[in-house]
């Protein structure tokens, strides 16, 4: 199907850190959308966008990119990407960022949605599932329009490790990962295939368990190696895939942190589940048939997210349905 031209689409990235900057680069180089890169630090988004613009002669893209400290310049965005907040440092879990990033995500989402009330919101700030819920509470949008990107990233990591283990092309591998974007995420080998062949027919349970564990700690492994900050190329690639779907004419089945209103027996929570994603946002949550052990793992992950939401409940207006898991 024909792609939309840059002039028909506008994406505003809230936060010009490593993930936000890498995402801006992917979007303009792929001629996906015009981009506004916003940050509170004066000069940072302007400098990054100038650097990206100076690559135009090499890359040949035609998208416009603007660096700004003014939310007014984000007006009329089709997609708002929440990338603001502090990144993980060695020894930190994603949940260590909870209180600080809640305040940041709530504020930037409210300000941006005020200028783009028809936008879809994609969250990449950690802890991802809780921050997706915070952004939804701040936005006032229908839940189908607010989501987090973690599932796409987690599945991509699982696919990469499987490809390395088997020596196959990663293009032939399709993985499914449910649950929170953290140590209790739930990779599903039964729903992971290589050219249609279930992973469970190609690897022993011991090898699969090792790959699952590495997937769960994939982000922490990068944090440890970098010593300062976390992953950004892979998260940016995952967010870009979601944005391309949201701006295009295709419907895709992707795992994202979506709002649940009874699916999988869970309510009033954002968590990684497979959804049908399109330019209309989350069209539908797809409920997979889970075995007892898989369902128990999913509920453990959900309770961890719920505990995080309970910690930050006092930071958000009590204008949404009561929580329940």
UniProtKB/Swiss-Prot annotation:
Database matches in HAMAP family: Malate_dehydrog_3
Active site per database record: 181
GO terms, molecular function: L-malate dehydrogenase (NAD+) activity
Main EC class the enzyme belongs to: oxidoreductase
Similarity field: Belongs to the LDH/MDH superfamily. MDH type 3 family.
GO CC terms, sorted: cytoplasm
Record-linked PANTHER family: L-2-HYDROXYCARBOXYLATE DEHYDROGENASE (NAD(P)(+)) (PTHR43128), L-LACTATE DEHYDROGENASE (PTHR43128:SF16)
Residues that bind NAD(+): 15-20, 39, 101, 124-126
Protein name according to UniProt: Malate dehydrogenase
Positions that bind substrate: 88, 94, 126, 157
Classification of source organism: Bacteria, Bacillati, Cyanobacteriota, Cyanophyceae, Gloeobacterales
Chain's role: Catalyzes the reversible oxidation of malate to oxaloacetate.
């Amino acid at each position: 199907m024909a792609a939309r031209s840059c002039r028909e689409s506008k994406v505003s990235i809230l936060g010009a850190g490593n993930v936000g900057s890498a995402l801006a680069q992917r979007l303009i180089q792929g001629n996906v959308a015009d981009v506004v890169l916003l940050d509170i630090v004066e000069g940072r988004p302007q400098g990054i966008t100038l650097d990206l613009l100076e690559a135009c002669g090499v890359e040949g893209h035609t998208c416009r990119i603007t660096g700004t400290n003014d939310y007014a310049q984000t007006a009329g965005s089709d997609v708002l990407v929440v990338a603001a907040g502090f990144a993980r440092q060695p020894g930190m879990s994603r949940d260590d960022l909870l209180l600080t990033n809640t305040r940041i995500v709530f504020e930037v989402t409210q300000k941006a949605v005020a200028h783009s009330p028809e936008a879809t919101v994609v969250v990449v700030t950690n802890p991802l599932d809780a921050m997706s819920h915070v952004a939804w509470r701040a936005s006032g949008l229908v839940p189908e329009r607010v989501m987090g990107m973690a599932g796409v990233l987690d599945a991509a990591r699982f696919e990469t490790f499987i490809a390395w283990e088997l020596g196959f092309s990663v293009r032939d591998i399709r993985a499914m990962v449910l649950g929170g974007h953290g140590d209790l995420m739930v990779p599903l080998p039964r729903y992971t295939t290589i050219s249609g062949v279930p992973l469970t027919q190609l690897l022993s349970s011991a090898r699969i368990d090792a790959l699952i564990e590495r997937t769960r700690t994939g982000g922490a492994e990068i944090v440890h190696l970098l010593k300062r900050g976390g992953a950004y190329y892979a998260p940016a690639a995952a967010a870009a895939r979601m944005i391309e779907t949201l701006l295009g004419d295709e419907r895709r089945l992707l795992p994202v942190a979506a709002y649940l209103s009874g699916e999988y027996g869970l309510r009033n929570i954002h968590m990684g589940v497979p959804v049908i994603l399109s330019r209309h946002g989350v069209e539908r949550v797809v409920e997979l048939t889970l075995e007892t052990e898989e369902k128990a793992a999913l509920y453990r992950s959900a309770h961890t997210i719920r505990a995080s939401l309970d910690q930050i409940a006092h930071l958000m207006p009590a204008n949404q349905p009561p929580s329940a898991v």
